[in-house]
Amino acid sequence: PGAVYLGVVHRLDRPTSGVIVFARTSKALPRLNKSFAERQTKKTYWAVVKNSPPKDSDTLTHFLKRNPKQNKSYANTKEVPDSKKAILHYHILKKMQRYVALEILLETGRHHQIRAQLASINCPIKGDLKYGFDRSNKDGSIHLHARKLSFMHPVKKEEMTITAPVPEDV
């Protein structure tokens, strides 16, 4: 009954799989947008990367500068003009023969943040040609998965956690 509403709360990079949240009412959308903008959400990603990072777990802090012509972000260790601070925390889930699986907790949500920051420590994501992996995946995806998203329900004020299953081909 009545009009149907669906508002986009956040986005994922095109080749990324996983959780995405939509608001079902026009009242919920600005509330959810605010919780994302104020970093009141907890975002967990899984990635398969080429090399083992220097530490089994760490916090990466960079200043990302976006190049719109290339649709790419560059990670800098020091602040540069027009850059934005980017913070993520990672730990190793599993070491495989050729790859390493990481769990990433995203503190900020910048353009291509995980991709740029992991590439900056010589850990490009499997299939991600743009950020230094040597070959693409057959389907054009990258091995970056938005695994879990926790946030406060915009009306009920209860914590919600949504977990996305891992794609079968991973």
Where are these regions (language model features)?
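RNA pseudouridine synthases
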Residues: P1-V170
